[in-house]
């Protein structure tokens, strides 16, 4: 028995994916260098002092490495067996945090234990990934069964709701990344497409709502969205119902009638042709309803729901923006869409981070030589906006190098996930890479002014123990599961 255990441990070391560990260590080192650059001031004499953020980050790094080692030493079956227990404990912590009297920067997402501040939302990600992987890997689970899918989705949505109640909408949005895993496991592509379509409706509808189309009293935003709904519906008829004739009929009639009335509005009597489009949409809905009842094909009914939902979502978008979202979130979206500039207010962070990145040039200003960061022009420059420090001190070369490291990590995780012998490991692996991909894409995007500022950290770079520990646990559990593939009967 002892010999078998020793052989298993020796085999474990050989089975570990050392390439991923090497990327992890490289990201830790570059992250610490960035924290040094972001938190360093001209009066600092020792970047290793525990009184500085760079010094404390070394502590978080050391404890993270120890934590990773402990995770690797545990039996891989532990994570499968106790996944629901871990998930339940984290849900309780998230629920308790809602009633936390201590607010930090307007958020109740922190548990304050004396000098220690812990953010359960950072740890809930790996717990949710374990729970949903456990549920979806059970015998008989079928992604095409709506009850099964709804149950799996509820595992993801529940922590989202608790985190939103903590006034941490940005952290809650990270859970949308699980839809990439759902798609890999067989979720209908129409669901993913619907999500993308809703984003397009919101962005185009809000951004161009006040812009007139071709000097007619027609909102370009409303015109574009309603036309997209009709074209998307025609495309879905072609793809899901395999009826090319009906798809061409819907598209040609919708576009043809719209074009005729647009020309009439332009050259004869100006009027808002959105009303014509609404009429066309009503006819489209009736047409789809008739065929869903006549042919008994569910796909026609699903397309009908898509068309109705699209129109309802679009006309509720303005209400959500002005009545549901917090004022600071509304201002951020308006700034992102170019509706407001506000360089001294909501757009200040992004504007200053763009200046910092642009000033770095090709090769950067050098380690600890960034002026925008040293003079504290960029708020949150060592947490959410730490990527601007990379761009300023290391330049385009350094920023590109960091992004290539993250790309290498994502590609490596895809390879590891696909080689798992059981669905539990594959599903958890795709949860891990989806979370990393979302964090990197959104964080870098918001620093560059390409995505809304939602306040999520850059993995292994942003200062803080909760973030670093959370990402380390998330990654090393997967490495432990992957390493056991050669010992599974």
What is each residue range found by the language model?
Residues 1-7, 233-238, 249-261, 443-489:
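A juxtamembrane structural motif centered on a specific transmembrane helix
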Residues 7-24, 54:
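N-terminal membrane topogenic signal
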Residues 115-124, 166-167, 361, 453-472:
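Glycine/serine-rich anion-binding loops at beta->alpha junctions
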Residues 12-14, 149, 375-378, 420-421:
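Helix-boundary and loop/linker segments of multi-pass membrane transporters
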Residues 168-173, 364-370, 381-383, 454, ...:
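Transmembrane helix boundary and interhelical junction motifs in multipass membrane proteins
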């Amino acid at each position: 028995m002892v010999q078998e255990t020793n052989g298993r441990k020796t085999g474990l070391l050989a089975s570990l994916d050392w390439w991923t560990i090497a990327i992890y260590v490289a990201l830790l080192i570059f992250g610490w260098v960035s924290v040094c650059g972001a938190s360093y001031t001209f009066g600092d004499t020792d970047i290793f002092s525990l009184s500085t953020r760079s010094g404390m980050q070394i502590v978080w790094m050391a404890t993270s490495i120890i934590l990773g080692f402990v995770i690797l030493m545990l039996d891989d079956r532990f994570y499968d067996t106790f996944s629901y227990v871990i998930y339940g404990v984290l849900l309780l912590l998230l629920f308790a945090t809602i009633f936390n009297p201590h607010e930090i920067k307007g958020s109740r997402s922190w548990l304050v234990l004396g000098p220690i501040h812990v953010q359960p939302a950072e740890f809930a990600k790996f717990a949710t990934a374990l729970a949903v992987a456990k549920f979806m890997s059970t015998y008989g689970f079928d992604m095409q069964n709506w009850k099964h899918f709804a149950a799996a989705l509820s595992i993801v949505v529940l922590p989202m709701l608790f985190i939103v109640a903590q006034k941490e909408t940005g952290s809650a949005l990270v859970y949308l990344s699980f839809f990439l895993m759902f798609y890999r496991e067989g979720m209908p592509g129409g669901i993913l497409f619907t999500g993308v379509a809703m984003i397009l409706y919101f962005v185009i509808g809000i951004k161009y709502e006040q812009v007139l189309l071709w000097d007619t009293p027609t909102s370009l935003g409303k015109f574009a969205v309603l036309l997209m709904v009709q074209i998307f519906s025609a495309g879905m008829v072609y793809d899901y119902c395999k009826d090319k004739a009906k798809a061409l009929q819907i598209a040609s009639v919708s576009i043809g009638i719209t074009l005729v009335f647009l020309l009439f509005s332009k050259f004869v009597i100006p009027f808002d042709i959105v009303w014509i489009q609404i009429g066309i949409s009503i006819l489209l809905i009736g047409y789809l309803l008739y065929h869903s009842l006549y042919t008994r094909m569910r796909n026609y009914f699903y397309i009908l729901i898509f068309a109705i939902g699209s129109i309802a979502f679009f006309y509720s978008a303005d209400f959500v923006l002005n009545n549901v979202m917090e004022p600071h979130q509304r201002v951020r979206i308006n700034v992102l869409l170019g509706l407001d500039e506000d360089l001294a207010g909501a757009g200040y962070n992004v504007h200053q981070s763009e200046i910092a990145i642009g000033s770095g040039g090709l090769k950067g200003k050098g380690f600890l030589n960034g002026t925008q960061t040293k003079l504290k022009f960029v708020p949150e420059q060592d947490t959410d906006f730490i990527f601007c420090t990379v761009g300023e001190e290391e330049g385009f070369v350094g920023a590109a190098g960091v992004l290539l490291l993250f790309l290498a990590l994502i590609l490596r995780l895809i390879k590891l996930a696909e080689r798992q012998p059981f669905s539990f490991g594959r599903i958890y692996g795709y949860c891990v890479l989806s979370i990393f991909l979302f964090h990197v894409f959104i964080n870098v995007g918001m620093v560059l002014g390409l995505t809304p500022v939602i306040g999520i950290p850059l993995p292994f770079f942003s200062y803080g123990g909760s973030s670093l520990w959370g990402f380390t646990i998330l990654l090393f559990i997967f490495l432990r599961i992957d390493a056991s593939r050669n010992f599974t009967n």
